Amino acid sequence: MVESTFEPKITAESVGQVIRAHLRVLKLTRKPSREEFLTIAKVAGVGILAVGAIGFIIYVLLTMLPQWVAQ
């Protein structure tokens, strides 16, 4: 059996680097305006509805197709 040679090394320095990287990103962020928030919410809602509609169409096809083929 092949042994894994990967040994993760977590050090205080590597943890500090990750925290600094996250803080740098957080400093660049800002609160979205109401208009930006509404636009993002609308786009996300349309995406969710589209995925649901596609799933429903696939469900209907998979349940109705065997009945159509059997006739």
Swiss-Prot record:
BP GO terms, sorted: intracellular protein transmembrane transport; protein secretion; protein targeting
Coarse class of the protein's main subcellular location: membrane
InterPro entries, per the entry: Prot_translocase_SecE_dom_sf, Translocase_Sec61-g, Translocase_SecE/Sec61-g
Pfam families noted in UniProt: SecE
Organism superkingdom: Archaea
GO MF, one example: protein transmembrane transporter activity
The keyword DNA-binding appears for this protein: no
Keywords recorded for this protein, A-Z: Cell membrane, Membrane, Protein transport, Translocation, Transmembrane, Transmembrane helix, Transport
One GO CC term on file: plasma membrane
Subcellular location, record wording: Cell membrane
Membrane protein topology class: Single-pass membrane protein
Bilayer-crossing regions: 43-63
Xref: SUPFAM superfamilies: Preprotein translocase SecE subunit
Complexes and interactors: Component of the Sec protein translocase complex. Heterotrimer consisting of SecY (alpha), SecG (beta) and SecE (gamma) subunits. The heterotrimers can form oligomers, although 1 heterotrimer is thought to be able to translocate proteins. Interacts with the ribosome. May interact with SecDF, and other proteins may be involved.
Protein task: Essential subunit of the Sec protein translocation channel SecYEG. Clamps together the 2 halves of SecY. May contact the channel plug during translocation.
Family classification: Belongs to the SecE/SEC61-gamma family.
Protein name, entry field: Protein translocase subunit SecE
